[in-house]
Amino acid sequence: MSRKWLYSTNHKDIGTLYFIFGIWSGMVGTSLSLLIRAELGNPGSLIGDDQIYNTIVTAHAFIMIFFMVMPIMIGGFGNWLVPLMLGAPDMAFPRMNNMSFWLLPPSLTLLISSSIVENGAGTGWTVYPPLSSNIAHGGSSVDLAIFSLHLAGITSILGAINFITTIINMRINGMSFDQMPLFVWSVGITALLLLLSLPVLAGAFTMLTTDRNLNTSFFDPAGGEILFYIQHLFWFFGHPEVYILILPGFGMISMLFHKKEEKKKHFGSLGMIYAMMAIGLLGFVVWAHHMFTVGMDIDTRAYFTSATMIIAVPTGIKIFSWLATLHGTQINYSPSILWSLGFVFLFTVGGLTGVVLANPSIDIALHDTYYVVAHFHYVLSMGAVFAIIAGFIHWYPLFTGLSLNPYFLKIQFFTMFIGVNLTFFPQHFLGLAGMPRRYSDYPDAYISWNIISSLGSYISLLAVMLILIIIWESMINQRMILFSLNLTSSMEWYKSKLPPAEHSYNELPILSNF
């Protein structure tokens, strides 16, 4: 048994490991977010120590991004579905695939260790010096966090190499690039983004480590360096990273809309591919919109504003293509379609607040306020997470051979929908009123919206517990899937046996072009 999991080279087993790891990390991250909302539910102090509060905020961000969304989307769905959708026997490098999973638990262990030794890493996920330098954060906490991110980065780079090689070399005969499913495209583009952006982060963090431990002065003004040089390096990684988090979600939502609505093809499939490529490319040239407040030249600001707004064009193409795919169908409100519709609506809201923040004069007022928190949580907490749950419900019968209870799933969807909106919508008002991020206390004027926001987080907690109960119920009752209701145009459902056998295909499939 232990050999099956520890030494596995099977993409389905490794994908399952990623899912288990991601769900567990997601529960840790959710617990941390509830601590944050408990602290902010009322003015005054609950935790009592702001360093601990900042450590919780930092750990919440890192865990949700690197140990929940990325392992589930790229590691879980990517490993399970890409080989099946390509008709490949497995991934290109199965043993490397196993290694890239088993580097993640040590990485998470290091991150949690960084929070519980010394004073914890209370730097925020951006890890800016001088706060992250050895003056403000002496001791080993920040070093442990950096080492943890190095490991997570190695994991992602290895995974990216594996996906790119698999997609280029292991398609079945006759499958051209434009015939690949949109989810495979989205994972491929995501892998390319990871491969290009993570080395920059590794370089920045290595320089920060030597500044802290080896007396160099890469980011130290005393050594004649520019302090915000690290911000350029960090955000050159950090902005593509947010597209890395959402692109596989785009692919999943595209698959869901045309499979669940029984369309043979998605509307504007080629346009969707080009839109994802454009988003990936533009994601690399807009990083400084996170840094409007460092004091930039007017021409630089004009460039980053326009470039940021241009990203809205391919994103708009995707949203209207999804709506066009739905057009003319009798919408079947199955749980996964509810999540997908929720994704489209809430992701659009998050995107619109992003266009607001792209304007430097507005951003200077709103930078580091709760308006920014609301913006990126609409995109991540209601974009990435909704896509994950939609995909999980849709492909759960493929992964397990079991069915979930659709009635409970609908109750859970509406609970979660109300919970997340009640949590994050009021934060727009708090931000416009000037409440800053990363503070554990606030003036009494902000109390009403904070109480509502914290109430929403408790409802979201109930929803998370509900979906865990629904999955547990399905596994206890073992309601087997007798036959797949999906069209044969989707190759992952091709086998009559669910879940697929250890070797997916006895012989490689043939693609017929009519």
Curated annotation (Swiss-Prot):
Q: Name one Pfam family in it.
A: COX1
Organism phylogeny: Eukaryota, Metazoa, Ecdysozoa, Arthropoda, Hexapoda
Q: In which pathway does it act?
A: Energy metabolism; oxidative phosphorylation
Please tell me, according to the UniProt entry, what happens when changing residue 491 to I. Answer: In haplotype 2
Q: Which InterPro entries match?
A: Cyt_c_oxase-like_su1_dom, Cyt_c_oxase-like_su1_sf, Cyt_C_Oxase_1, Cyt_c_Oxase_su1_BS, Cyt_c_oxase_su1_dom
Under the subunit heading, UniProt states: Component of the cytochrome c oxidase (complex IV, CIV), a multisubunit enzyme composed of a catalytic core of 3 subunits and several supernumerary subunits. The complex exists as a monomer or a dimer and forms supercomplexes (SCs) in the inner mitochondrial membrane with ubiquinol-cytochrome c oxidoreductase (cytochrome b-c1 complex, complex III, CIII).
GO MF, one term, reads: heme binding
Binding site residues for heme a3:
375
The scientific name of the source species is Ostrinia nubilalis (European corn borer)
Question: Which residues of the sequence carry a binding annotation for Ca(2+)?
Answer: 39, 44
Q: Where is this cross-link: 1'-histidyl-3'-tyrosine (His-Tyr)?
A: 239-243
> How does this protein sit in the membrane?
Multi-pass membrane protein
The entry's protein name is Cytochrome c oxidase subunit 1
What does this protein need as cofactor?
Answer: heme; Cu cation
